[in-house]
Amino acid sequence: IDELDIPTLGTIVHEYIHFLQNVSTPWGLYDSMVRYNIMAETYAFVENATSTITLPLDIDYSPELANKIAIVKCGMGYCPLADTRRNDFRIDVNERICIHRKYKQLNNRTLPVITLDICFTDGSKQAITLGANIIKESMAALYQMLIDETATHERYDLPYNLVKIIAEQHFSAIASDNIKLITICYISLFSLSPAEVLINEL
């Protein structure tokens, strides 16, 4: 590690934070268990098939697993890194991000949904659902920038700089305290509703 340059060390720390998010938080463990159950039921579907299997698979997961998948999907929120519709996620920080809180009924649970109205520097606007995807990336990027100040992820404010930008616009008292922002991101992953906890704690 002593021989690594600062950018490489920062990248390694960023990815190691993702490892910790996945193995040391209730959200990470719940998500992993749901994915494992998906693999188990998929394997059982293939193993028990009595006719030719066609792709893509169309599996009716058990009601219990389907419910857990819906909880994870709701908590994960939007994933900009999987969005192929745009390749520049620079946020216009002069336009205030609007935060909306709604609720979604899922069987016998009421799940909070936090949506954000975001303006980009190219003039386009987008409403996104805040969730663990963005929170995890923002947290890892904040850690990375503690080591490598040049890792600003300029073209990718969403997801890497979003928590910082929200803090600067709405919670200025803590916006300059990156350690506190990292801590709040981490705390939010101790819930099945990470976005709500993040906004509440900010």
Residue ranges, per PLM feature:
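Short pre-active-site segment immediately N-terminal to the catalytic Zn-binding motif
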Residues: I1-V13, A127, G131
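Long, well-structured alpha-helical subdomains associated
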Residues: D60-L202
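Post-HEXXH active-site segment of zinc metalloproteases
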Residues: I6, N22-E64, D117-D122
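Active-site recognition of the HExxH zinc-binding catalytic motif
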Residues: G10-V23, A140
